[in-house]
């Protein structure tokens, strides 16, 4: 009898401890969605004659004559913490040039977006031309939030389509230090901060600035890894879009920074923490002396106080050579040291220099672009102004298409 009483008390104590301790959060498991699988991205008005082209059996929308692919995905609504990874793979389907690319998500809280604009149901809000000129859609407006970039990338010169060893264009362009041309290029980024825009249902897409009917083929995967801890509650975050100058649809090359700073207002609610700014930027203008090839300082301010002051620049572009079979090549003469039969010697040699090797404004042909992240430790609740300044940016001049692709958003924890 005594043993039964002791057992009952032990069981009751265990139940009491369990009730008072952390609640075990039910697991939903890891999740992977293959959004696109070798899907063409191209300028094909004969195939996609409208700004909006309805999806077929693959559920993929083709916007702006095929230069945007868009699809609705559904992710589980997790209760445990998650790690979210995005993978994008690109190969040329015949376009040999380097092109700007953007993988993006349409903000659910925005009543106006790229999809319903393409359908003709909505249009970008009007802008104050004294501040934004004709640059519609780059900052928030009535019932509108800018498109949020999941990943910025740049296509290489002709990877895939021109990668065969016997390709007539490229077979003699491979430098001695490359054993083969790659068939595609892939990038992975941690996009956990952007999970609030994806959970439940969301429209995600890929834009490539191609003007050829061949274009590219693109694949995209979102992987969600759930925490294995029984009590690891999901960190509740909010994403606030601030700016996006990528010219997705009915927009123009953004050379506005050559003439003025660009500002937009936002509001920080009370009680939030760990407020961070994500800033993505690339400079363009592929002619000699263009903004693509000249270092230009970027200054980012909030309420007139600098939070980021830097020169966005990549000097490692030669490391992407194997992804650029169709790049233009020049011969550069230099004095080279080498090992001769009787020891070290020197002589003049001509070495190939690929266009893809040249340093650029925060990108290389075949690279992705990582966001700059700034922790805003002292920001207070209330209204604020976000400003981007590129003082030495150059205007478009005929076919000298200088412009800067800038996107920015805030992330905070609730």
Predicted region positions:
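Extracellular/secretory-pathway and virion-surface proteins
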Residues: 20-414
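Bacterial Sec-dependent N-terminal signal peptides
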Residues: 1-28
């Amino acid at each position: 009898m005594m043993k039964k009483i002791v057992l009952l008390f032990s069981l009751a104590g265990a139940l009491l401890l369990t009730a008072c301790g952390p609640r075990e959060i039910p697991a939903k498991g890891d999740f992977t969605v293959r959004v696109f699988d070798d899907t063409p991205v191209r300028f094909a008005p004969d195939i996609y004659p409208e700004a909006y082209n309805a999806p077929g059996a693959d559920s993929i929308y083709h916007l702006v004559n095929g230069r945007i692919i868009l699809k609705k995905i559904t992710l589980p609504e997790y209760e445990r913490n998650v790690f979210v990874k995005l993978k994008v793979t690109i190969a040329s389907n015949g376009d040999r040039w380097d092109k700007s690319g953007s993988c993006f998500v349409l903000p659910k809280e925005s009543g106006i977006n790229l999809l319903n604009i393409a359908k003709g149901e909505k249009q970008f809000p009007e802008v104050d031309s004294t501040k934004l000129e004709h640059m519609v859609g780059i900052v928030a407006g009535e019932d509108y939030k800018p498109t949020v970039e999941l990943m910025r990338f740049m296509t290489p010169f002709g990877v895939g389509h021109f990668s065969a060893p016997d390709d007539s264009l490229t077979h003699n362009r491979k430098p001695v230090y490359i054993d083969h041309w790659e068939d595609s290029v892939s990038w992975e980024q941690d996009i956990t901060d952007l999970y609030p825009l994806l959970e439940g249902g969301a429209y995600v897409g890929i834009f490539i600035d191609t003007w050829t009917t061949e274009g590219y083929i693109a694949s995209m995967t979102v992987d969600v890894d759930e925490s294995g801890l029984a009590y690891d509650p999901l960190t509740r975050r909010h994403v606030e879009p601030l700016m996006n100058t990528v010219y997705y649809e009915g927009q123009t090359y953004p050379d506005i920074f050559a003439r003025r700073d660009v500002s937009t207002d936002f509001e920080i609610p009370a009680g939030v923490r760990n407020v961070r700014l994500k800033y993505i930027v690339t400079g363009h203008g592929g002619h000699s002396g263009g903004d693509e090839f000249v270092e230009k300082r970027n200054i980012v301010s909030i309420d007139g106080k600098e939070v980021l002051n830097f020169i966005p620049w990549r000097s490692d572009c030669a490391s992407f050579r194997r992804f650029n079979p169709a790049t233009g090549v020049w011969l550069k003469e230099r004095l080279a040291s080498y090992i001769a039969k009787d020891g070290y010697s020197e002589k003049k040699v001509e070495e190939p220099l690929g266009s893809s090797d040249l340093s650029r404004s925060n990108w290389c042909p075949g690279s992705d672009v990582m966001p700059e992240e700034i922790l805003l430790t002292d920001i207070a609740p209330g209204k604020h102004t976000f400003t981007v300044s590129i003082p030495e940016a150059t205007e478009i001049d005929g076919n000298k298409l200088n412009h800067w692709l800038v996107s920015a958003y805030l992330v905070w924890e609730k």
